[in-house]
Amino acid sequence: MLPVLFSQEIKTEELSEVVVYATNYKYLHSLASEEPAAIPVKMLQRKVAAFDLESSDYYQDDYDYYQISFYIPDGKILAAYDADGKIIRTIEKFENVKLPESVNNAVLDRFPGWVVSEDVYLVRYHEKKGVSQTYKVTLKNGDKTLKVKLD
């Protein structure tokens, strides 16, 4: 007896293009630079931007703004949202994440023979004032230790 084979005809339809913007695209756009941030930093920043305040347990109609904290082992972000879920400001701190190549090269060119032993990446975002980014780097050369701040 021969096996019975079935075939299925699949219709293909062309769909119109849909562009979706996050409510907090300005926040993400202001953090964009020529050199991408370390992966854990980008992931947490995207989570902050995509946070849906109105469907969260924290949301109540009575409040004008909300402060929500986000944590990962490498860092944390404290974000302030308005009642519509738009990010007003953030304070961000990440420890020992990969430095951007330009920052790493600038440190090594300025301090030859020194090695980066620790780093802290600080970010402050404000919807009206923009963003400020600072790196605090600890350098070691044998028994000597040097702390450097870069912006």
Give the location of each predicted region.
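Sec-dependent signal peptide cleavage junction
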Residues: 5-58
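Exposed beta-strand-loop-beta-strand "reactive/processing" segments of non-cytosolic proteins
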Residues: 38-79, 124, 128-148
